Amino acid sequence: MRGSSWTRAGALAAPLAASLLLAGWSHAAAAACQSRSGKALRPLVELYTAEGCNQCPAADAWLSASARRQPRISWLAFHVDYWDAVGWVDRYAAAAHGQRQQYRLQSLGRQALVTPQVIVGRDAPVDWRGAAMAQLLAESSRQVAPATLAMSASAQAGGRMRVDMQARLDGDRIAGPALLWLALYEDGLETAVAAGENAGRMLRHDRVVRKLAGPWKLE
């Protein structure tokens, strides 16, 4: 897939060893690669967005620019499907993305399901346009990672990809339930929107989640 990559999403702990076989991804996506996490926490920024929402293109552009400026932060765009009934069907949307948004909000004691909405790690939704976002990311980046992750990916016959993961908890720095997710995202996507609030616009997207696997509950 053009510009595709894997990233870890969600709260992480261990021990865990898991393997996945994914169909339909191009051979170029992962001929053979390995990755291991470092000691510093890599903040996760989740943008919940939709092509049918006229306030979302600005947030999409912000995420694309931020991902280029700050590659040590994990940026993910989850396109939600609850806008699909309002004039335009988002081809990148999935019901699982809206369900994840709802779960994340409930775990943070919040209820407002809106787009665009940005959640950073275990913090409550934050205004992506404000100074609080930069401060939160800076503070998060100085923290020590609570888990060690190792991942390898290799191309398989028939256009399939094998992904192997191992996770190990380092100490007791994770409070509450620990879940492991795996997300495949794609960059450089474009859509000519023909209906709905963004009719007539060419929308450009990066870090779009195309496959979400998990969660694995870690005891």
Feature names for model-found ranges:
Residues 1-12, 118:
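N-terminal export leaders
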Residues 29-114:
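Active-site-proximal cofactor/substrate-binding loop regions of enzyme domains
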Residues 89-219:
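Short, conserved sequence motifs used for protein processing/export or organelle targeting and
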